[in-house]
Every structure is written in structure tokens, then in C-alpha cells.
């Protein structure tokens, strides 16, 4: 089942789903994240509203331009939200989740529930759109907002940063993302999990490249996480392939050193929530790890993640007796004795408020950013961000780098990561940081990938028929302290 058709599988009346989807679109326009909207919905509404909201937000620019042509006088915000939601769902960019006549009929029914006086107006506008759709689509395609479904400032920034790739990045952001899994290396192998999925009738692909640590699996079709075998028992997590690069990069060998970090190394995950990278580190290494986050509520999500994966904070195993205890390479089971995980709330820019004075062997700084590299996975991001956000976040990133660098041991390494394709948050940030350091005090590692631009979706294969490497947009820089 694809996200564009997922809503059709739920028993809730479409008019109710459209009403709440319009509320979600209106909230995003007002600056609220889609996640914040969805968590307030009743459980029976949430899946359908999420599916329709993702579709509507991907085509919101085209729908907004079309509405301006169909109804030049902007209607009240609640009416406009329902109208552009329906137009986006009718837009020919991808298969509609419902038949056209059903969408129009149910949008009018939603209007009668939401704003009865506007029902006839919405009916007339939508039916006119269907009559004049080809001409309207052609007209809208001549505007940046209508052609690319991103704010003009975002388009301009990508043109500046990626003159050869900006169109591909913008158009790719409206394609559905792959669903990539990370198999818990303490519980099994990626190959064994692919075979287990096949027994359920689910097609999946290995990403065997060493850069991903050998634990990545891509589903041919996304599915609800609770339908994944072993998810509740901690055998697998959902994590994009780009994010799965962090742990192998941080723990692996540096230039001229084949050993990598030793067992028991002291590691800081400086912006740990929601805990995916923290967990990956613990799944593949024996560490003394401090997971830090400025938000205590988000830090609780790290604890939830570790609990589900049976990676608790005192080093003991939490593997139920009825589950197979897959052996570690050294023959142990569960979290290895001697490993230690501590969760602490604190601002990475203010080490004096949380640091105990013991230096770290390695620091992971997955810094707050615009999330411009994961917009296909979070389609509300493009409408929530403002033109000056990248500059403001870059200042925060710079402050974090400056505050954390002194906490490293000589010979230690810092991995800087953002899920952004904007260079101000990636290579430009690192270039400026290195220029501020004393000469010879830092050694950038050439095997870190730098900017990773979002790759094709999981329907794309190379000439051999093998699935392409699939990942979100990311940036990685690995720096050794000399």
C-alpha cells in the first residue's frame, strides 16, 4: 500500500478525514508542525489524516496557485484550507487517493460540516477545476511555487548551493520516501531479517555497502511499524540509510589508524533525541556513552527507544526468555557487561552545566538544522521554515561546535552531522569552524562523505536490476583532534 492510497483503506468517512486534513493544512500554514497536529487526533483518524495531509502538503504550492486563479479573492482561512486541500488531492502529480467525483462530493460534505455557507462555493470551484484542469495545470507550471511546491526563497537557496542539482532536489522532494530499516545487530543480521520478511510476503532489499554498517534493509512497500516482525521486541528500527552512516563513521578507523575506537570508549551523543543514532552506537559497540539533549521530554523518547531495543542504561540485558538470544560476535547475549549509558538533559552549548570534566574519545554532534534534506519524509518542513532560519540555526551549530571541541581528548574525533542540504549548515559551517581553530590542531577525515543529496526512491534500480542506494539528504564531517 502506498502513502497516496493509504487513506482509502480506513473506515472513517472521507468527509471527516478531509475536514481534519484541512485543519492540519491550516495549522501548518500557521506555523504548527504536522506531527504536533496529528498527536492531538483520535487514534481512528490519525492514519487517514496523515496520509491525506502528506499528499496535500506535497502539492500545496500548485493548489495555492490554482485557487488564486479560480477564486482571486482569498476566502476565509478555514474555507481556503479545505479548498486547497481538495485541489491538492485532485492534482495530477500522482494518483489521487480517491475517485475525482468522490473527492469533490466528500469535500462539499466536509464544507457542510465545517462552514455550511461555503459548501456551494467549494462545489463550484472544484467542478470548475475539473473542467479546466489541463489549462490550469499548464498555467500554474509557469510559476516557481506552482512548478516546484516549495517557497521561492527555498528554491533560490538550492539554485545557489546546487546549480546543477536544484531541480532534481525540488522535484524529488515530492516523491514518496523509501522505508528503510536498521536491524539490531545484537539480535540478528540484515540478511536473516530480509528472509523473515519474505516469509510474510514482503519484498525487501539489503544495502550491503560498508558505509551503512551492513544493517540496512529497504522495504519495497512501506508498512505500519507494528506489522514489522520483531519491532515491538526490539529486533528492528526504522531509520533512513543516511542516518545509519553516523555510528560506523564515528566508531570506525581514522586515516592512518586501522583500529577504530576501542571497547569501553567514552562517547558523547550531544543531541541524542529521539535516540536512533544512540541506539545504533550501542548495537554495534561496547561504549561508555552519555546521551545529552536539551529537551527532557524528547530525552524520554531516547529512554523509550533504548527500552524497546533492550539497550537499557545500566548495561544489563532485557531479552525476554521466549525470544532467541542471538549471539554477539564474542558469544555474549544482551548488552555486554561493562557497557554504560547515561541520559542527561543539558544544552550542548553550555558544558559547564552538565559535563563532569572527563574528556571524551568521540563526540557525535547531530546538530539542530532546517531539516531540508528530509523534506520528502516531512512535507510540512518546507512550509514551516522561513528564509532566515538557516542563518539562525547555523549560528547555533557554530556555538555547539565551539563548546564541544574542548571536551575531546587529544586524538579524539568529532562527527558533525545535519539532515540538511543547505551548505550554510554543512560544508560552509565546517570550513568556518576549522578556520577558527589553531593551525594544526584538527585533521579532517577524507572518508567522511560531506554532503549527501537525496537519492532516488526505492522504485529506482540501476542497469543490473539491483535497487539503487536510497537515502535522505545529509551532511557528515569527521574531524580528529591532534
Model-predicted regions and their roles:
Residues 293-297, 389-392, 396:
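Short beta->alpha hinge that forms the Motif I/post-I loop of the SAM-binding pocket
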Residues 1-224, 331:
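Class I Rossmann-like S-adenosyl-L-methionine
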Residues 127, 297-298, 370:
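Conserved Rossmann-like nucleotide-cofactor binding loop
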Residues 132-284, 292-338, 450-460, 464:
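Glycine-rich nucleotide cofactor-binding entry segment
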Residues 289, 341-343:
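Hydrophobic/aromatic anchor residues within beta-strands of the central parallel beta-sheet
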Residues 49, 107, 122, 158, ...:
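Residue-level signal for inorganic ion chemistry
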Residues 107, 267-277, 360-376:
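Conserved proline-anchored active-site loop of SAM-dependent methyltransferases
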Residues 231-233, 348-370, 376-380, 386, ...:
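C-terminal catalytic and target-recognition region of SAM-dependent MTase-like enzymes
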Amino acid at each position: 500500500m502506498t502513502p497516496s492510497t493509504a487513506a482509502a483503506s480506513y473506515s472513517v468517512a472521507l468527509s471527516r478525514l478531509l475536514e481534519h486534513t484541512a485543519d492540519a493544512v491550516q495549522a501548518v500554514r500557521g506555523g504548527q508542525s504536522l506531527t504536533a497536529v496529528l498527536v492531538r487526533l483520535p487514534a481512528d483518524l490519525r492514519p487517514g489524516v496523515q496520509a491525506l495531509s502528506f499528499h496535500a502538503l506535497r502539492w500545496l504550492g500548485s493548489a495555492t496557485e490554482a485557487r488564486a486563479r479560480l477564486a482571486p479573492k482569498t476566502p476565509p482561512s478555514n474555507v481556503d484550507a479545505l479548498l486547497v486541500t481538495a485541489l491538492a488531492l485532485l492534482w495530477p502529480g500522482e494518483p489521487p487517493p480517491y475517485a475525482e467525483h468522490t473527492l469533490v462530493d466528500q469535500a462539499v460534505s466536509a464544507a457542510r460540516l465545517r462552514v455550511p455557507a461555503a459548501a456551494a462555493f467549494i462545489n463550484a470551484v472544484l467542478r470548475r477545476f475539473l473542467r479546466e484542469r489541463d489549462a490550469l495545470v499548464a498555467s500554474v507550471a509557469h510559476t516557481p511555487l506552482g512548478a516546484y511546491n516549495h517557497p521561492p526563497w527555498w528554491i533560490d537557496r538550492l539554485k545557489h548551493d546546487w546549480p546543477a542539482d536544484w531541480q532534481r532536489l525540488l522535484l524529488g522532494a515530492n516523491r514518496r520516501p523509501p522505508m528503510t530499516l536498521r536491524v539490531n545487530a545484537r539480535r540478528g543480521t540484515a540478511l536473516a531479517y530480509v528472509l523473515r520478511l519474505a516469509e510474510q510476503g514482503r519484498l525487501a532489499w539489503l544495502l550491503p555497502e560498508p558505509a551503512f554498517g551492513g544493517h540496512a534493509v529497504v522495504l519495497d512497500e512501506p508498512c505500519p511499524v507494528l506489522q514489522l516482525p520483531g519491532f515491538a521486541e526490539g529486533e528492528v528500527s526504522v531509520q533512513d540509510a543516511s542516518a545509519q552512516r553516523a555510528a560506523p563513521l564515528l566508531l570506525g578507523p581514522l586515516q592512518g589508524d586501522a583500529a577504530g575506537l576501542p571497547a569501553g570508549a567514552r562517547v558523547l551523543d550531544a543531541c541524542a533525541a529521539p535516540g536512533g543514532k544512540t541506539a545504533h552506537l550501542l548495537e554495534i559497540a561496547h561504549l561508555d556513552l552519555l546521551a545529552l539533549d536539551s529537551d527532557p521530554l524528547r530525552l524520554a523518547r531516547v529512554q523509550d527507544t533504548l527500552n524497546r531495543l533492550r539497550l537499557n542504561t545500566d548495561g544489563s540485558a532485557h531479552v525476554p526468555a521466549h525470544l532467541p538470544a542471538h549471539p554477539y560476535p564474542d558469544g555474549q547475549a544482551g548488552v555486554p557487561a561493562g557497557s554504560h549509558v547515561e541520559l542527561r538533559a543539558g544544552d550542548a552549548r553550555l558544558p559547564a552545566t552538565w559535563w563532569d570534566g572527563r574528556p571524551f574519545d568521540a563526540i557525535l554532534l547531530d546538530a539542530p538544522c532546517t531539516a531540508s534534506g528530509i523534506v520528502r519524509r516531512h512535507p510540512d518542513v518546507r512550509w514551516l521554515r522561513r528564509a532566515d532560519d538557516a542563518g539562525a540555526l547555523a549560528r547555533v551549530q557554530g556555538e555547539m561546535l565551539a563548546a564541544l571541541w574542548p571536551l575531546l581528548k587529544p586524538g579524539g574525533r568529532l562527527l558533525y552531522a545535519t539532515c540538511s542540504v543547505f551548505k550554510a549548515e554543512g560544508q560552509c559551517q565546517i570550513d568556518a569552524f576549522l578556520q577558527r581553530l589553531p593551525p594544526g590542531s584538527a585533521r579532517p577525515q577524507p572518508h567522511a562523505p560531506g554532503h549527501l543529496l537525496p537519492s532516488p526512491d526505492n522504485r529506482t534500480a540501476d542497469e543490473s536490476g539491483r535497487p539503487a542506494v536510497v537515502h535522505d539528504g545529509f551532511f557528515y564531517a569527521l574531524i580528529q583532534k591532534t
